[in-house]
């Protein structure tokens, strides 16, 4: 039996109907139903793209001989010290 008997559930249902009203509960039920329907549709749509064949890869064009592809870039620069003003709250 547990803590909540069927009589308790009926009393709770009556209180909920009195507090929220049947119109609001109907709208809530409709919204929940549409949400579940949309979720199922989204789950079904996620499966469809996996079934489609992958597009054929394009043939790679050879790189020009004059420009190497993976050469590291080195930047020659020198750091300069910046004098920042002293904040009043740190003194």
Curated annotation (Swiss-Prot):
GO terms for cellular component: TAT protein transport complex. It holds the Pfam family TatA_B_E. The keyword Chaperone does not apply. GO terms for biological process: protein transport by the Tat complex. It is found in: Cell inner membrane. Residues 51-64 have a biased composition (Low complexity). Residues 42-91 are annotated as: Disordered. GO terms for molecular function: protein transmembrane transporter activity. It is a single-pass membrane protein. Belongs to the TatA/E family. Part of the twin-arginine translocation (Tat) system that transports large folded proteins containing a characteristic twin-arginine motif in their signal peptide across membranes. TatA could form the protein-conducting channel of the Tat system. NCBIfam families: PRK00442.1, tatAE. HAMAP family: TatA_E (MF_00236). This is Sec-independent protein translocase protein TatA. It comes from Pseudomonas syringae pv. tomato (strain ATCC BAA-871 / DC3000).
């Amino acid at each position: 039996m547990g803590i909540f008997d069927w009589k308790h559930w009926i009393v709770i249902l009556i209180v909920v109907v009195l507090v929220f009203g049947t119109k609001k509960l109907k709208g809530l039920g409709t919204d929940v139903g549409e949400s579940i329907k949309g979720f199922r549709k989204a789950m079904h749509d996620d499966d469809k793209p996996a079934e489609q064949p992958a597009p054929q890869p394009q043939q790679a064009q050879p790189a020009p001989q004059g420009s190497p592809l993976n050469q590291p870039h080195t930047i020659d620069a020198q750091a300069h010290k910046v004098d920042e003003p002293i904040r009043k709250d740190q003194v």
